[in-house]
Amino acid sequence: MAAQGFLLIATFLLVLMVLARPLGSGLARLINDIPLPGTAGVERVLFRLPGVSDSEMNWKQYLCAILGLNMLGLAVLFFMLLGQHYLPLNPQQLPGLSWDLALNTAVSFVTNTNWQSYSGETTLSYFSQMAGLTVQNFLSAASGIAVIFALIRAFTRQSMSTLGNAWVDLLRITLWVLAPVALLIALFFIQQGALQNFLPYQAVTTIEGSQQLLPMGPVASQEAIKMLGTNGGGFFNANSSHPFENPTALTNFVQMLAIFLIPTALCFAFGEVAGDRRQGRMLLWAMSVIFVICVGVVMWAEVQGNPHLLALGADSSINMEGKESRFGVLVSSLFAVVTTAASCGAVIAMHDSFTALGGMVPMWLMQIGEVVFGGVGSGLYGMMLFVLLAVFIAGLMIGRTPEYLGKKIDVREMKLTALAILVTPTLVLMGAALAMMTDAERSAMLNPGPHGFSEVLYAVSSAANNNGSAFAGLSANSPFWNCLLALCMFVGRFGVIIPVMAIAGSLVSKKSQPASSGTLPTHGPLFVGLLIGTVLLVGALTFIPALALGPVAEYLS
């Protein structure tokens, strides 16, 4: 079993790196404001028609463009879900959503979280899925990538005030990166058996002779961008464990690759744009080390079986509860770590049914800020915050002003870095405390004791860090939970983007200083270890008390 797990991890990472390297070169061209071959003419026409200026923006203008697009998308999606029953492509005549569920869902998809307090096949029409959710899957992913584009330019430009043009970046990312790759993935899914139709739900007779209603819909097109954009919201309630979304072992492998593809490519692109590919490899090494250790822990925990079942005399040599037998325990463990290391949230197994340690690792990966590969764009700019913090700590130890890529890191940057890093832990801990204060909110827990608290802690961790997966034992479709989680998702997304853009605006105006004998190398194994230690230290100091009340207490009981 250990050899199989090692081979699975190694194969996954090898194929991932092979695919991400050329994509990273293409992204580097876009960051350097070089159109991809054959696209410049199309871009000129698309900007000329609405009269949009393609001149460069400062950080405030860039930020306002990103926020404006997302706020407009939030309003459109909210009213679309409320009035779903008036819109076309609703063969099941599904009603509009309640205001709190519509708000939660709109915020969820605009923030790239895709938390779902509903069952897709019984709640949303084809129009809502396509024109509402799928569109936001593209736009939220493009927004995250645009922010990291701006931050990378801030490190590589000198004595400037502009970071590029948000509309140019969003257009290029959507048209030349997300759309073509998602199309290829969708066609592959269709070839493998994923649904893509507009038929009404089909009544069929099962082999036992009973009647069953099979849901239909344009699944493959949404599934592709759901994975590629690290969105994660399933067309069906069972998400990627549903055979209509994820029909074969091959589609499952491609889904895992799609989740990590752009975050990995962005690391390669960062090194190329910075003029030192070792910088990108340093980030990949740090992410990969944490990732491999986490996968190993989850695989080990799930292979050990459920000790509570063993105590009752049941055969539980491995923990298969809540897992698809066609994927097995090792693949389910790998997928769980992939989807929570990235801010995806898609699942092929029920994380609520994992062992105490097996469920704690995905929760902890979210709590440290989704920086182990992370979401498209958001993962890398989240890790860059820890890079700045690690550089600052190293500067304190050697008595020098911290610098990164030749840029001095001053008090302003460190204050903004601390603010951005503290946003999500504050939301998680305060949200969990608020949810545990009254009987009404605690009644949403379907399990007592430490595991019930773990369900609450997982939910707010998932929402605040824009992941979207859940311990499904929590009944979250209530006004309190919909509003609380919507607030966590909104602040967790934009409360980090705003200081990140402010950091970019500060750095882009600085000159790059040449390296000296006292400059800390940020591309070697020493800095990789320092960066990993910084991530672990912040995660440990912040969440160990809360984890001790949940999964740790459950493991020890």
Curated annotation (Swiss-Prot):
Example GO molecular function: P-type potassium transmembrane transporter activity
A Pfam family this chain is assigned to: KdpA
Any one cellular-component term (Gene Ontology): plasma membrane
Keywords for the protein's UniProt record, in alphabetical order: Cell inner membrane, Cell membrane, Ion transport, Membrane, Potassium, Potassium transport, Transmembrane, Transmembrane helix, Transport
Primary subcellular site in the record, as a coarse category: membrane
Lipid bilayer topology: Multi-pass membrane protein
Protein localization: Cell inner membrane
Coiled-coil features, chain-numbered ranges: none
Transmembrane segments: 5-25, 63-83, 132-152, 170-190, 253-273, 283-303, 329-349, 356-376, 379-399, 416-436, 484-504, 526-546
Subunit description: The system is composed of three essential subunits: KdpA, KdpB and KdpC.
NCBIfam families hit by this protein: kdpA
Family statement drawn from the similarity comment of this UniProt entry: Belongs to the KdpA family.
Function: Part of the high-affinity ATP-driven potassium transport (or Kdp) system, which catalyzes the hydrolysis of ATP coupled with the electrogenic transport of potassium into the cytoplasm. This subunit binds the periplasmic potassium ions and delivers the ions to the membrane domain of KdpB through an intramembrane tunnel.
Protein name: Potassium-transporting ATPase potassium-binding subunit
Gene: kdpA
